[in-house]
């Protein structure tokens, strides 16, 4: 496999806050270096359920993850597995749920916090965190610049074809402060500023890039149900592919087949949605 793509998931950012507060991403849209669409989360619009949908291309009603309290090793084929089957190298820097869904369950703190498994059928290079002890006051999230740097390190050291990064910072802060607040305005600005220097590095290394969220949040910092604030987020794409008209709404089940299409890998038979990129 000679194609490369990175998926960056900023957990819990509603569409309006992406478009209003991420000045670097929006600047690249204005310059023509990126394109942006609205992205609609599955139902329930709960984090774990959305993680599973993003990578399997099927709804929670099919893959079976009904919420954060129901995490298990998924049976459906996923982006990691399909990339590996086509000869690609995979990596993930993310919450431990991702390792449990797509590699091993339950998560072993010592064995699974960091691994390099060249023969794995799913995730070759994993760097995970659990957020154990998470609460309203202490959100237990790593520094995002450290996560971006870790993904870059994996790309350079191991030649990833597909890498994904997931950070819970903005979701956790949104639950505490709600998204219509000075604290969240600043947090989104800081996230945008920390992410921005890595975008040119990844592009220079030959990666296409998708930046999005798993779901949004409403005025009270809630998500899990139906509605524009809970379900709708933005999706930014950096790369040469042609995409749909700007007013198109991307369904979450389209992400997995789109990523695999851009990598030149075969989508699983269970991934029925069409790629939104040519």
Predicted regions and their residues:
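Feature captures the catalytic ectodomains and active-site-proximal regions of enzymes
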Residues: 1-278
């Amino acid at each position: 496999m000679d194609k490369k793509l990175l998926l960056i998931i900023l957990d819990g950012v509603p569409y309006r806050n992406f478009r209003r507060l991420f000045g670097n991403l929006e600047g690249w849209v204005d310059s023509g270096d990126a394109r942006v669409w609205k992205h609609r989360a599955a139902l329930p619009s709960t984090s774990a359920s959305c993680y599973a949908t993003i990578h399997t291309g099927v709804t929670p009603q099919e893959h079976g993850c009904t919420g954060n309290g129901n995490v298990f090793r998924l049976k459906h084929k996923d982006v990691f597995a399909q990339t590996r089957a086509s000869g690609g190298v995979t990596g993930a820097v993310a919450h431990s749920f991702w390792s449990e869904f797509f590699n091993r369950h339950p998560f072993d703190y010592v064995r699974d916090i960091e691994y390099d498994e060249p023969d794995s059928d799913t995730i070759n290079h994993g760097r995970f965190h659990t957020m154990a002890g998470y609460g309203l006051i202490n959100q237990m999230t790593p520094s995002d610049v450290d996560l971006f740097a870790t993904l870059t390190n994996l790309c350079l050291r191991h030649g990833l074809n597909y890498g994904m990064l997931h950070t819970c910072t903005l979701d956790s802060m949104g639950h505490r402060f709600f998204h219509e607040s000075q604290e969240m305005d600043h947090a989104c600005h800081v996230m945008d500023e920390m992410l921005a220097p890595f975008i040119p590095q990844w592009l220079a290394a030959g990666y296409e890039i998708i930046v999005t969220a798993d779901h949004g949040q409403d005025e009270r910092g809630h998500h899990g149900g139906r509605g524009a604030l809970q379900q709708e987020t933005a999706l930014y794409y950096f790369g040469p592919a042609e995409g749909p008209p700007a007013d198109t709404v991307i369904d979450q089940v389209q992400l997995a087949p789109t990523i695999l299409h851009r990598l030149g890998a075969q989508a699983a038979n269970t991934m029925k949605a069409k790629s939104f990129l040519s």
